Amino acid sequence: MKGLLFIVSLLCLTLHQRVWAYQVIGMKSDVICADIRFTVHCICNELGLFPTSRLSKPCPWPNRGRRSADDEDYLFEEDEDDEFFHPRALSPPAAKSGDERLEDEVSFHSRSKRDIAFHEECCNIRTEHKCNKTTVELYCRRYTR
């Protein structure tokens, strides 16, 4: 009976912790695979969990139009521009109004400027990093173009 209670408690704790699997469409594999920590820092910054952190360089995803996880054809399109963009410029409306702190209920897919797609395919790299209470699972995918 104690074993069952332990397993149920462990399962509840595991399900309570939010897990985000990230892969940004159009991300160049050499950029994301070469500097996993920096990419995770970018993700945490975009989530608003490190609102005062300064990034040493631009985050490795380009500024493009609206993105959606439902657009599978978009995975194979060429990048139209090579400009890099700081994620703070992509803040959701709550952050644009001056409130830098994002609420947990704010969905990542409610972005008006662009959406980030989430996929699990990777280049044999799976890292987990703690972003405050959120575990970031970063999957790095190698693109063949």
Swiss-Prot record:
GO terms for molecular function: hormone activity. InterPro entries: AGH. The keyword Cell membrane does not apply. It is found in: Secreted. Residues 68-112 form a propeptide. Disulfide bonds join 33-122, 42-59, 44-140, 123-131. This is Androgenic gland hormone. The lineage of its organism: Eukaryota, Metazoa, Ecdysozoa, Arthropoda, Crustacea.
